[in-house]
Regions:
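Interaction-mediating elements
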Residues: 1-259, 265-268, 289
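Strand-connecting loop/turn motifs
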Residues: 68, 152, 170, 301, ...
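Solvent-exposed coil/turn segments that connect beta secondary-structure elements
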Residues: 76-78, 91-97, 105-110, 178-184, ...
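Gram-negative/organellar outer-membrane beta-barrel architecture
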Residues: 115, 226-227, 246-505, 593-594, ...
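C-terminal outer-membrane beta-barrel translocator/porin domains of Gram-negative envelope proteins
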Residues: 215, 219, 223, 311-315, ...
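Membrane-embedded beta-strand positions of outer-membrane beta-barrel proteins
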Residues: 306-308, 338-342, 411-413, 504-508, ...
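In a subset of proteins, long, contiguous C-terminal domains/tails are tracked
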Residues: 503-505, 528, 532, 541-546, ...
Length: 728
């Protein structure tokens, strides 16, 4: 209807702003009015264009497809007090629901009938279920996949048709699914994989000049040597010579090769032929064989990327963030990805605070990461296993794990420098080993058995030292230390068929417990502190964080997104406080957008004094909760708008430190910072560029103003963020 609320076909918004814009500007001929009408207006829906009679006929046709053969749909036009407005009321009489009474499968070959009988528990159509057209088609698709997974390569959906009898029993359907008489002969025979030719190309039309043959496998390529080692491709290629053709093997092979990220184009074609084989009795038999030709076109070897974020706040704090990186595909002919990136950010004060003018850079951070990803799970047990050894294991019945996509093993080293001008310079050096894999589209896992980092102060000023002397909690969190960590992340996402999916990710990590267990076996107490690693104290903690996103597709051009994020960290044993880099914070382009990073918290503690320039050091916590709601309508083309509401804060677990900072279950919801705002997003296909304007609504501490809206200055509680990608 005109002024539909959130895309609803029934409810209308009480304020049809787009209709008002249309009425106000559509009759004007000037360019500005035409632009306003096109961008912000919405043409009213006319009864002449609705055609309720046709809609009623379409609805009856849909009822037939659902099994309501006697369903009736009538309509009535309801006039309103305004003669220009009217509503259409539809009356739907479902009638009797026709159900399946008997089901028979006819004319299938003997082996095909055996396959059907052995999988009847998986049948979509069963006695007593509604007679739905969609269910009938799903059953035909099930049989097609069943047959093609047992060698019937040429079998198609159209080779079976339905006969339905609705006369014998009122309200019941006797159904027959029969194979058609004009089926091609090869569709009733089982086919086996024969020779496999794999063609490596750097360009689609490249001529291949050399080849390498290994039994039934032939690799063709251009140049003096193969561009990639054979075993890398064979790990993803589920097709094997002399094996019965299975469509699922072909599907997994294509998906696996694509997920490697090395090829821009993959294609599998089959050439049928008849071969002679000798059975166990020495008799010659003829076998239908499919020779596979697989074309693999390499993607560009290098990827250069730039990621940028910018932020500005009306209190005067501004600064950009930049990431520049280079990725080399197939770095060492083993499908590896070598990634090198440099990142940096800085922030400065542009207006006068209580301490006077400050135009110099207040803080900056820069660093570099180097990572190498392998397209397999590499462990000490399989790191040096050869291709021939893998083939022998396969013949001996050791089936490889089946993954959704290509699993990866990533080795990473990093170095970061954090500088707070006039206070400190902190260095963080680290390395990690991570395994990523997926068992299906819905379930993904990431396990890091070793994440080792060393954090130390390269420089501290006397002013910073005096601050630390007066704040033991912050001093402990920023002390020099090793962090030997282990982490696991599980991500669930709804199946692709759902209109309104969810994504739920949970990360559990720990640090120092394995080392402390070793010390415990050596006779030291678990709770004893001061234990060292390489002559430096190490951290000991347990951390959990969960992230939940829900999408509602309101209509083809607008989406509503809800986001929840929560986390908690416990420090114990060798640590009285978690490291500064592991603490939680809120604010910024991907959090509460009305406030800067580390601009709020912990709890209802007030660090709003501009003279307190080290406040962002203190605005961290052991506990975090954040909630976001964002409406994303399309404005036109690839330009989308955003209307959002953000809330959240961080707290400390230890109430002894400060009453204002401590988490209390009965009061935490009262200490949530709240902000709103609007934004625009430009979808460029490969990535999204967005600008968000955040406006503060509520601060968790006492500002001297009563009521929910307690912002002391509207002008000073706004933030502008330029970022790449969606916030969640």
């Amino acid at each position: 209807p005109t002024g539909a609320f959130m895309g609803s076909s029934y409810y209308r918004t009480p304020f049809p702003v787009r209709l008002w814009v249309w009425n106000a500007f559509s009759q004007s001929d000037d360019a500005l009015s035409r632009w306003i009408t096109k961008v912000f207006g919405s043409k009213p829906k006319l009864m002449a264009n609705v055609n309720p009679q046709l809609r009623a006929q379409v609805a009856e046709h849909q009822l037939d497809k659902l099994g309501y053969f006697n369903g009736k749909v009538d309509y009535e036009v309801l006039t309103q007090s305004n003669p220009k407005e009217a509503k259409v009321a539809y009356k739907v009489d479902l009638g009797h629901l026709w159900r399946l009474d008997s089901i028979a499968y006819l004319n299938f070959p003997e082996h095909g009938r055996q396959l059907i009988d052995s999988t009847m528990s998986e049948a979509i159509i069963k006695k007593g279920r509604p007679f739905k057209v969609s269910s009938l088609e799903q059953e035909r698709q099930r049989l097609t996949r069943l047959f093609r997974n047992h060698g019937y390569y040429f079998y198609q959906n159209g080779y079976a048709s339905y006969l339905a009898d609705t006369v014998n029993t009122p309200g019941k359907v006797n159904l027959r699914l029969a194979m058609v008489d004009s089926i091609e002969p090869e569709a009733t025979r089982q086919w086996y994989i024969g020779n496999i030719n794999i063609n490596f190309k750097k360009q689609f039309m490249e001529e291949m000049t050399d080849s390498f043959v290994r039994r039934y496998l032939k690799f063709r390529y251009a140049g003096k040597k193969m561009p990639i080692r054979a075993g890398v491709v064979l790990r993803e290629l589920k097709l094997r010579p002399r094996k019965l053709y299975m469509v699922d093997d072909e599907t997994r092979a294509k998906a696996g090769l694509q997920s490697m990220g090395l090829f821009s184009y993959t294609n599998v074609q089959y050439v049928p032929r008849t071969t002679q084989v000798i059975d166990s009795l020495g008799n010659i038999q003829y076998r239908d064989t499919l020779d596979a030709n697989i074309d693999l076109v390499f993607d560009k070897p290098y990827d250069f990327y730039i990621e940028a974020n910018a932020k500005g706040k009306t209190t005067g704090r501004v600064g950009p963030e930049l990431v520049v990186g280079l990725t080399k595909r197939n770095a060492f002919r083993g499908g590896e990805k070598l990634d090198i990136n440099f990142h940096g950010s800085h922030e400065w004060q542009t207006i006068n605070g209580q301490s006077g003018s400050s135009s110099k850079i207040n803080s900056y951070e820069f660093g570099s990461d180097v990572s190498l990803s392998f397209p397999s799970i590499i462990t000490p047990w399989n790191a040096f296993r050869t291709m021939a050894q893998n083939e022998r294991r396969f013949r001996n019945g050791h089936m490889p794990h089946r993954y959704y996509g290509t699993p990866t093993t990533t080795v990473k080293a990093s170095m970061n420098i954090l500088n707070r001008a006039g206070y400190f310079r902190r260095h963080v050096a680290g390395g990690e080993l991570t395994y990523d894999w997926a068992t299906s589209y819905q379930h993904r896992h990431s396990f890091s058995p070793l994440i080792l980092s060393y954090e130390y102060m390269n420089y501290t000023s006397p002013k910073f030292d005096s601050i630390m002397n007066n704040n033991v909690y912050v001093a402990t969190s920023m002390a020099d230390r090793f962090i030997p960590k282990m982490s696991y992340t599980y991500t669930y996402r709804s199946a692709q068929k759902y209109r309104s999916p969810i994504v739920w990710s949970t990360t559990v990590s720990e640090a120092g417990n394995v080392l402390s267990l070793g010390y415990l076996l050596a006779g030291k107490k678990w709770s004893e502190d001061g234990k060292t690693m390489f002559k430096n104290e190490y951290s000991q903690f347990f951390k959990m964080e969960t992230d939940f996103v829900k999408y509602w597709t309101l209509n083809p051009t607008s989406t509503l997104v809800a986001h929840l994020n929560a986390g908690v960290i416990w420090s114990y044993g060798n640590s009285s406080q978690a490291p500064y880099t592991e603490m939680f914070y809120v604010g910024g382009a991907n959090s509460i957008r009305a406030f800067n990073v580390r601009g709020i918290g912990p709890g209802k503690q007030d660090y709003s004094d501009l003279s307190n320039k080290y406040a962002n050091i203190l605005r961290t916590g052991d506990i975090k909760f954040q909630a976001n709601l964002e409406y994303r309508p399309r404005i036109w083309g690839d330009l989308y708008g955003a209307l959002f509401l953000d809330a959240g804060n961080v707290w400390m677990k230890d109430a002894d430190l400060s009453e204002n900072e401590a988490f209390k279950f009965g009061e935490f919801y009262k200490q949530m910072a709240v902000g709103t705002g609007v934004g625009i997003r430009y979808d460029m296909g490969m990535f999204v560029v967005r600008v968000d304007w955040g406006i503060g609504l509520h601060l968790p501490y006492d500002t001297g103003k009563s009521g929910f809206y307690n912002i002391p200055s509207f002008k000073k509680n706004q933030s502008l963020h330029l970022a790449v990608g969606y916030p969640f």
